[in-house]
Every structure is written in structure tokens, then in C-alpha cells.
From Swiss-Prot:
Residues 1-40 are annotated as: Disordered. Pfam families: Ribosomal_L33 (PF00471). This is Large ribosomal subunit protein bL33. The gene is rpmG. Residues 15-25 have a biased composition (Polar residues). It comes from Cupriavidus metallidurans (strain ATCC 43123 / DSM 2839 / NBRC 102507 / CH34). Residues 1-12, 30-40 have a biased composition (Basic and acidic residues). Transmembrane segments: none annotated. Belongs to the bacterial ribosomal protein bL33 family. NCBIfam families: PRK00595.1, rpmG_bact. Keywords: Ribonucleoprotein, Ribosomal protein. GO terms for cellular component: cytosolic large ribosomal subunit. HAMAP family: Ribosomal_bL33.
Amino acid sequence: MASKGGRDKIKLESTAGTGHFYTTTKNKRTMPEKMEISKFDPVARKHVPYKETKIK
């Protein structure tokens, strides 16, 4: 059975251009703006900003 909640799956893509991404969920009602967070990119081997993109 599917969940009723307002959480949507999102993809956080690296801005370093390596193609690496993380997936997570986000509550669209409390955070309508696009997310940007600094996370570790194992391809670049350093912390870089990750920006929210749509899951295709």
C-alpha cells in the first residue's frame, strides 16, 4: 500500500560535474524551494554542493 504523506522523492546531483547523485525525500509543503546541500562526492573525493533535480 502506498503512503499518503506529502513527501516526494528527489535527486541531489553533484555540481562538480562528476555525474554522482544521492536520492532522498523532502516534504513539499514545508520546503517548497529547491534544496542545496554540501555532501561528499566520492568521484571528486571532496565535499561539493549538491542541487535538487527531478527524478526521471
